[in-house]
Regions:
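Residue-level hotspots within the lipid-embedded alpha helices of multi-pass solute transporters
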Residues: 47-51, 84, 124, 128, ...
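Short alpha-helical transmembrane segments in multi-pass integral membrane proteins
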Residues: 1-43, 97-164, 212-267, 324-355
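Structural signal for membrane-spanning alpha-helices in multi-pass inner-membrane proteins
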Residues: 131, 174, 200, 204, ...
C-alpha cells in the first residue's frame, strides 16, 4: 500500500513538472549543462558587443586625437553608471519574469515587464535632464582640462539622446531573456556595432566625401546605432516573439501596483549595489582625470579590456537568473537547490578561466 502511495506521489510530481514545461523525469545534469551553455555564450557575446558600441568610439577616436578620446572616455563613464543601473532593472525583471515563465503565467510577466519599462524610462529621463542642464558640471567631475571638456561637451550634446533608446532596448531584451529568447540580443548588438563603426569611419575622419566631424561624428554613429536597435527589436518583438508572450504595445500602459511593489522591493538593493559599483569604476577616471590627457586615455584602454573580461561573469549571472528563476517557478525546490549547486561549480570554473 505504501509502495502504491509512493508511486502515485511520484506520478503526481511528474505531472506537476510537465505542466510547468519540464520533462516527466528529472532532467540529467548533462541536460542542465547543455541548456546553460546554449544561452551562456550568446549572452557573453551580446554583452561584449553592447559594450563595444560605445567603446568603438573610444578606439576609433584614439586615432583622431588624444583630447577627443579622453572626452569620449569621460562621457562614457556616465554611460557605464547608467548601464549598471539598467542592468539591475533588467535583472530584477528576469528574476520575476523567469519564475512566471516557469509557471506558464504570462499575464503577471507582462505586468512586471511594464513596470520595469516605466522605471527604465524614468531613469533615462532623469539622466537626460541632468546632463542637458549641467553638461560641463557633469564633465568636470572627471577632468578639468579645458580641451577635454570642450570635446566631451560636443560628444555629450549628441550622446544624451541615446539614453532613451538604450533603456528601451535593454528592458525589452530582459523581457525576452525571461522566456529564454537570447539569440536576437547578440544579432542586434552585432548590427549596432557594424552600423556604429561604419558611420564612425565616415564621419570622424571624413572619408568618401563625408564631412570630417571628429568626436561629433562618433556620437552620431552611436545614436544612429541605438535608434536602429530599437526599431529592429520592436519589429521582431511584436511580429514574432510577441506571439510567444502575448505581448502588445498596450500592455505597457497597464501596471499592477502589487507586482510593481514586489519588483521594486527586490530590485532596489540591486540598483544600489550596481550603482555603487558603477560609481566606484567611474571614480578611477575622476582621479586620473585630474592628471593628464594621456593618463585618461591609458585608463580608457585598460578599462576596456577589464569590461570585456567581466562580460564572462555578467553572462554567467544572466544565464543563471533565467534557469534558476524558471526552476523556482516550477515549484520544485529540491531540484532548484540541486541546480544552484551545479551553477556554483560552473561559476568557479568560469572565474578561474577568466582570471
Amino acid at each position: 500500500m505504501q509502495q502504491e502511495q509512493s508511486i502515485s506521489s511520484q506520478n503526481l510530481s511528474d505531472s506537476r513538472l510537465n505542466r510547468f514545461g519540464f520533462h516527466s523525469k528529472k532532467p540529467s545534469d548533462s541536460a542542465y549543462y547543455k541548456a546553460f551553455f546554449s544561452m551562456y555564450p550568446l549572452l557573453v557575446l551580446q554583452n561584449v558587443v553592447t559594450l563595444s558600441v560605445n567603446l568603438a568610439d573610444n578606439m576609433m577616436l584614439g586615432a583622431y586625437g588624444e583630447s577627443a578620446l579622453s572626452g569620449a572616455a569621460a562621457v562614457n563613464q556616465i554611460q557605464f553608471v547608467y548601464q549598471c543601473l539598467l542592468t539591475a532593472l533588467g535583472d530584477g525583471l528576469v528574476m520575476f519574469g523567469s519564475q512566471y515563465w516557469g509557471k506558464k503565467q504570462l499575464s503577471p510577466l507582462r505586468k512586471i515587464a511594464a513596470s520595469a519599462m516605466h522605471f527604465g524610462l524614468l531613469l533615462s529621463a532623469v539622466l537626460f535632464l541632468l546632463v542637458s542642464i549641467f553638461p560641463i558640471q557633469a564633465l568636470r567631475i572627471f577632468t578639468t582640462d579645458s580641451a577635454i571638456l570642450e570635446q566631451g561637451a560636443q560628444y555629450l550634446n549628441i550622446i544624451r539622446f541615446t539614453y532613451l533608446f538604450f533603456a528601451i532596448t535593454q528592458i525589452l531584451l530582459a523581457t525576452l531573456r525571461s522566456v529564454e529568447i537570447v539569440g536576437i540580443a547578440f544579432r542586434l548588438s552585432c548590427m549596432a556595432l557594424l552600423v556604429n563603426c561604419s558611420i564612425n569611419y565616415l564621419l570622424i575622419f571624413g572619408h568618401f566625401g563625408f564631412p570630417q566631424l571628429g568626436i561629433r561624428g562618433a556620437a552620431i554613429g552611436t545614436l544612429t546605432a541605438r535608434i536602429l536597435e530599437v526599431i529592429v527589436l520592436l519589429v521582431y518583438l511584436f511580429r514574432s516573439a510577441g506571439k510567444k508572450l502575448g505581448l502588445h504595445f498596450s500592455n505597457y500602459f497597464h501596471v499592477d501596483p502589487v507586482l510593481t511593489k514586489d519588483y521594486l522591493k527586490t530590485t532596489a538593493p540591486m540598483l544600489v549595489t550596481n550603482g555603487l559599483w558603477g560609481v566606484n569604476t567611474a571614480l578611477q577616471t575622476v582621479i586620473l582625470g585630474h592628471m593628464t590627457a594621456a593618463a585618461i586615455a591609458a585608463n580608457s584602454v585598460a578599462s576596456t579590456l577589464y569590461m570585456l573580461i567581466k562580460s564572462t561573469a555578467v553572462g554567467a549571472s544572466s544565464t543563471a537568473s533565467v534557469m534558476i528563476g524558471k526552476a523556482v517557478g516550477s515549484g520544485d525546490i529540491p531540484l532548484t537547490k540541486h541546480y544552484s549547486k551545479l551553477l556554483q561549480r560552473l561559476f568557479l570554473c568560469i572565474g578561474v578561466l577568466s582570471g
